[in-house]
Regions:
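Extended beta-strand/beta-hairpin segments
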Residues: 1-57, 64-150
Length: 150
């Protein structure tokens, strides 16, 4: 059974017309984007963004927010830290398509072992990680060095 949230704190709503070659916007108008299919997916590689880019930004922002909160609670200096999120899409052996994600932390003011621990804890706190756990491959790393996790 999926985990259930106990209280809805915020709801985002978006409308897309035209799928991957269309246009998307949020109900509050803060995001209003054209969508294009990358050439690697036999698209026209137009000037618009795509769902994978939007997912990468959303996941990285959410994950880093979780990490920053944990770092503050442990009195670690996360100033200047960055999360790089890489999202890949491809065919599944069983049919359809799937995603894979890699999250890499660059934290110049945090010791390597502390940074690894932050990545593991953020992975447990981040809503994107909780939503995708067990469904897609997520690779965690610090400065390109893998962080083993379940």
């Amino acid at each position: 059974m999926p985990a259930q949230i106990t209280q809805v704190l915020y709801t985002a709503k978006a409308v897309v017309e035209g799928g991957r070659e269309g246009h998307g916007r949020t109900s509050d108008g803060r995001l209003d984007v054209d969508l294009s299919v990358p050439a690697a997916m036999s698209g026209d590689d137009g000037p618009g963004t795509n769902p994978e880019q939007l997912f990468a930004v959303g996941y990285a922002a959410c994950f880093q927010s979780a990490l920053l909160g944990i770092a503050r609670g442990r009195d670690l200096d996360a100033t200047g830290s960055r999360i790089t999120s890489t999202v890949g899409i491809g065919p599944l052996g069983s049919g359809g398509f799937g995603l894979e994600v890699a999250l890499d932390l660059d934290a110049p003011n945090i010791a390597l072992e502390d940074a690894r621990e932050l990545m593991l804890r953020a992975d447990q706190r981040c809503p994107y990680s909780n939503a995708t756990r067990g469904n897609i491959t997520i690779a965690l790393s610090v400065n390109g060095e893998p962080v083993p996790h379940a």
